[in-house]
UniProtKB/Swiss-Prot annotation:
The active site is at H65 (charge relay system), D110 (charge relay system), S204 (charge relay system). PANTHER family: KALLIKREIN-1, KALLIKREIN-RELATED. Pfam families: Trypsin (PF00089). The lineage of its organism: Eukaryota, Metazoa, Chordata, Craniata, Vertebrata. Its main location: secreted. It comes from Crotalus adamanteus (Eastern diamondback rattlesnake). GO terms for biological process: proteolysis. Disulfide bonds join C31-C163, C50-C66, C98-C256, C142-C210, C174-C189, C200-C225. Belongs to the peptidase S1 family. Snake venom subfamily. This is Snake venom serine proteinase 5. It is found in: Secreted. It is an enzyme of class 3 (hydrolase). Residues 1-18 form the signal peptide.
């Protein structure tokens, strides 16, 4: 069954007012406390439900399907139970979506830009990850991370973020398992062909970091997570660089690429 990394929990959200679901890293290990300084936890009154990436002191990039009412963002978080001294919490001041996104089409232009209600300060556990200077190459080793489920079928959410390395694959690899994706979708295909490592429920909106650059946003994949020949699909950040930079510069009428 194919699910947007957030849709796995969507029914739960509707029934329990939790939040839209994302995915967690299956087949990974606990992240080093200092290796996810740009990772943002997006949460509501009950739980973490998505992640995002801090790209400067005032802006966060995540998936459009992570939008919800009354959410907050935590930066500098590692353990949900044992807070770091430098953790900072922010509210969204403004949220931006592609104005040319097809209405009610969750598969189209899955990216959201959030302006924080006040800037954050760099610290031991907080630092932005800049936008990519060039697109990634097939074969690149990419890093995934998040508080998503660490088991492929049942939702098992960890107290700390998990990390794993996967490979950037040719886009054609993701077409057979996901024929519903638009032919012109600006996405990346990444995973392990034999399966076992993948983002999963509650990882949605988090980063795909290839060769140290923020290249993708957790978007779409299969459920159960981590299946062979069913890699994850990630929104391609590089293709949205101009739109992001235009919004930050104050051109709120900017449109995304088709």
């Amino acid at each position: 069954m194919v699910l947007i990394r957030v849709l796995a929990n969507l029914l739960i959200l509707q029934l329990s007012y939790a939040q839209k679901s994302s995915e967690l890293v299956v087949g990974g290990d606990e992240c080093n406390i200092n290796e996810h300084r740009s990772l943002v936890a997006i949460f509501n009154s009950t739980e973490f439900f998505c992640s995002g990436t801090l790209i400067n002191q005032e802006w966060v990039v995540t998936a459009a399907h992570c939008d919800s009412t009354n959410f907050k963002m935590k930066l500098g978080v590692h353990s949900k139970k044992v807070p770091n001294e430098d953790e900072q919490t922010r509210n969204p001041k403004e949220k931006f979506f592609c104005p040319n996104k097809k209405k009610d089409d969750v598969l189209d232009k899955d990216i959201m830009l959030i302006k924080l209600d006040s800037p954050v300060s760099n610290s031991e556990h907080i630092a932005p990850l800049s936008l990519p200077s060039s697109p990634p190459s097939v074969g690149s080793v990419c890093h995934i991370m998040g508080w998503g489920s660490i088991t492929p079928i049942e939702k098992t959410l960890p107290d700390v973020p998990y990390c794993a390395n996967i490979n950037l694959l040719d886009d054609a690899v993701c077409r057979p398992p996901y024929p519903e994706l638009p032919a012109t979708s600006r996405t990346l295909c990444a995973g392990i062909l034999e399966g076992g490592k993948d983002t999963c429920v509650v990882d949605s909106g988090g980063p795909l970091i290839c060769n140290g650059q923020f290249q993708g946003i957790v978007f779409y994949g299969a459920h159960p997570c981590g299946q062979a020949l069913k890699p994850g699909v990630y929104t391609k950040v590089f293709d949205y660089n101009d739109w992001i930079q235009s919004i930050i510069a104050g051109n709120t009428a900017a449109t995304c690429p088709p």
